[in-house]
Amino acid sequence: MMIRRNIMAALLTATAMAGVNATHAAEPSVFPTAPQEPTAVTVAGKGDGRADDSDAIQQALDSARDKTGHGMVFLPSGTYRITRTLIVPPGVRIYGVGPTRPVILLGARTPGFQQGVSTMIVFGGGDQYRVGDVPVPVPTIVPRDKVVRDANSGTFYSAMSNVDIEIGAGNPAAAGVRFHMAQHAFLSHMEFRLGDGFAGVYQAGNIIENVHFQGGRYGIVTEKTSPAWQFTLIDSTFDGQRDAAIREHEVDLTMVNVAIRNTPVGIEVDRGYGDSLWGKDVRFENVSQAGVVISNENNVFTQIGFENALAKNSPVFARFRQSGRTVDGKGDAYKVASFSYGLMVPDLGHVGEYRTDADIEALPALPARRAPAIRDLPPMQDWVNVRTLGIVGDGKADDTAAIQKAINAHPILYFPTGFYKVTDRLTLRPDSILIGLHPAITQLYIPDENPRHAGLGSVLPILESRKGGDNILSGLGLFTGRVNPRASALLWRSGEKSLVEDVKIMGGGGTPTADGKMLGSLTVHTGDPVTDHRLDAQYPSIWVTDGGGGTFADVWSPNSFAQAGFYISDTSTPGHVYEMSVEHHARNEFVLDNVQNWEFLAPQTEQEVGDGPDAVSLDIRNSKNLLFANYHGYRVTRTYAPEKSAVKLYNSSDIRFRNVHVNAESGYATCDDEGCGTFLRASKYPFDNAIEDVSRKLFVREREFAKLDIGAAGRTIPTPTASMAPVEKLEDGFWSISGASVDTKGALYFIDRRFQRIHRWSEAKGLEIVRDQALDPVNLAVDASDHLLVLSSLGPKAGVYSIDPEGPLDQLTLIQPTPVRAAARKRTLLPVNWWNNGEFRDQLDHKSYEFTTLAEMFARDVGTPKAQEYVSPDGSLALPAFRVWQQGPIDHTGWRWSDGLNANGFVSGKMGERIFVTNASENVTYSGAIGKGGALVDLKPFANRGGESVAVDGQGRVFVANGQIFVYGSDGAQMGRIDVPDRPLQILFGGPDKRTLFILTHHALYAAKP
């Protein structure tokens, strides 16, 4: 929310010109009087800068939440000294109110803020997985013995605005705010005066707007956000940090109109990590060492891009940490029109290569700073409270006519918290501005089965704007009800300067309802899950059309009842999307049809297990001149169904993709009888392809890349380099196959898990079904007796059993875990592919101030011996008993997670032998020696591709499945590539001569003889 910054423009310009030691000018209070919110809690502290106001503020925070779990706290003008960490409950927003912006002050040398990292204000979270205990307490609380649950991927709406943070002298460990948030949370209109403190924000999330960081060791230090979505920083400044303005990794940092001054480093990506980093209109002034420090070169997760960056007295634009290579500026002042580093995909149908692209030109002087990306709201004195106009907002009275009358009479309307019932279209004036302060509890909603929205007919939205309008919609929730076929939340025809910000489309996660009922209260039982849950049965939630455009920032659209979350059609008016989350739809999340001149910075989609197995993330039709940067296409870990492509293009051209991230893994924090901890759940069903051009029948298999330009419609696309071996399809028609192994005769065994079938394929007999009992088999191996050792997900700790594929169908041997024992002839089974990440647990060492790297985590975890193992009846195979993490019920309706269950299959070796595995969290293939208890030690990176699987042939060649199959010599040099019609999931050698490379994809089995 941006209010009244324009009055500061001249002062800011003068300050910037005053010299390199100038600081950001103090901004006025954006809420000079308290908004009329009868349910808000006002802090009753002293506010004199001397008294300890910790208790007063905490009491207000603790009492703010209403029965829906949301609320607001008003902090009046004053200086509030605190002596311990303040905890903000989930769903609570803090607004500074009064003629001057209030300050939360950490007094000089406050005990507890001298060592490690200690946070003044922590935004907390709820018990997302109903654990009871707190699996990973926040480690930066003062006092340290206080147990606090961190914000997490289920923490929405929390915010702080119009409050300054100040750190007094002698607090080198102090951080201002921990903001590890999910959607619809923000910090705005703030100034962090950090002195000798550690950082302004430690652990960031969602969006920060119009925030200014002065001093400190760092302005922001952060790992990835709690849901692993993007973090967007808009209209903000950094000045005078001692080490770097921003230190981060994996946070998908997206910057728009950010200025960094008087510091050694602008943005530092931590050692051993990458990031999807995108900066638009970023200024670097007096940045002595590097504008950006890039780590993890030649890794797919390192995606660095800038557009229209400006620099003055900043000689090095980019420095590469490992190689020491630099990309230098040109002269004292220069412009970086474009910069990109990472895996570059030359065109559709091709694989990527690592490259640096930089377009830098010298300037005689820097131009003036651009206008804010988020326009100001009007001053408060112009707001008209709708409650003074006869509008009730009690969730019962029909407010439609009264709201329309108010819109017609007043350009600026303020909606206090409440549920405003709407039964017909509300049409905005060309200059209408509608404002709320908390979308979860300030909703315009349509009641279920409203007569005007029933049956077959054209779209009838809650709000409709006029073509070319100069409108603003801010801080409101819009809910179209459960059953209203003609409904849409917002039909937007407004012009380029219009703004939609802090708006939530209700219907997904975090949806309080006016009737107090669950979203699924009108579920039916036809047998069709889409019909049963009323999915895909309304018009798009947000529909921009007929020349509409403007800026859309911090918008969340997860209403599963709608056909799409964000739909744009028939417009060439420029549009700007910043930090938008569109999720949980049955068919499409984003749809663009006949659209030009739009940019999407940090768009994120998510397909849930129940509503999204068939959903496409981006559907682009008949469109051109588009930019997608820091795009994240995620499918939840519990997904059971494969899906072909995240992005689909139809008759579209001139599209720039920058920093693309397509995945399906997520951290999980819980407690069980083995203790508390975290684990990285990995689905086997991310989108197979990042992009599919339906018109050209071409795909982009790379799921992680820095750059792809979809060129002109009539262009000729070069043919990729030839595959080094032909591929033959052996069988198809499967749901999703993996978990394979071969026997001593070379026959292939594999699992189609959805249908609980264990198959065998051989040249002599073709495809057979060996077993199909309902035992939930996941992975298997063949022992020396040609019996199958099968890992099952059935049971609270999963299970292992053995079967004779030639024996009676009603017999199996259940194998119990036993203490690890050394045996010379025993082969140890290990996952061929691993996922390993530090989500949900801070990785910062509070003494060295270094983060544990992904490689260090991987080496630590795979190098830890397991105490028990599952041994095949003949004693020839041992599967380490990996810890199993349980989510949901203990029967087959719940989920189980472990390194063995996550894997696409197993590899094996004897003690001391070296094997190859992939770490998908780094996308690196390693070799390692098998140690006691299934430990993998003496790890050595082998190749900078490491996705789904790896296999080694009799010549020592190494085959890595990562979109296609990449072939390496034993020395690590790439020899070629085998192209497969579908994405390979598992590869292994078999056949009578052990020279057949079996290739398992979701739906088909292939073979090659390289």
Predicted feature descriptions by range:
Residues G711-P1010:
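Sequence-structural signature of mature extracellular/luminal beta-sheet repeat domains
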Residues Y414, F419, H576-V591, A646-V647:
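C-terminal, well-structured subdomains that either form a transmembrane helix-short loop-helix hairpin
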Residues Q604-D619, S623, G928-G946:
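A beta-strand-loop signature enriched in Asp, Gly, Thr, and Trp
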Residues E599-L601, T605-E608, V616-A629, V636, ...:
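Long, distal/terminal scaffolding or interaction modules
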Residues E250, R271, N296, T417, ...:
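Active-site proximal loops enriched in glycine and acidic residues that flank catalytic Cys/His/Asp
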Residues A553-G565, G575:
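Active-site-proximal segments of catalytic enzyme domains
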Residues R4-P76, I82, I87-A169, A173-G176, ...:
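Extracellular "leader-to-stem" segments immediately downstream of a signal peptide or signal-anchor
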Residues M72-T79, T83-T85, R93-Y95, Y414-R425, ...:
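Conserved metal-binding segment of the jelly-roll/cupin
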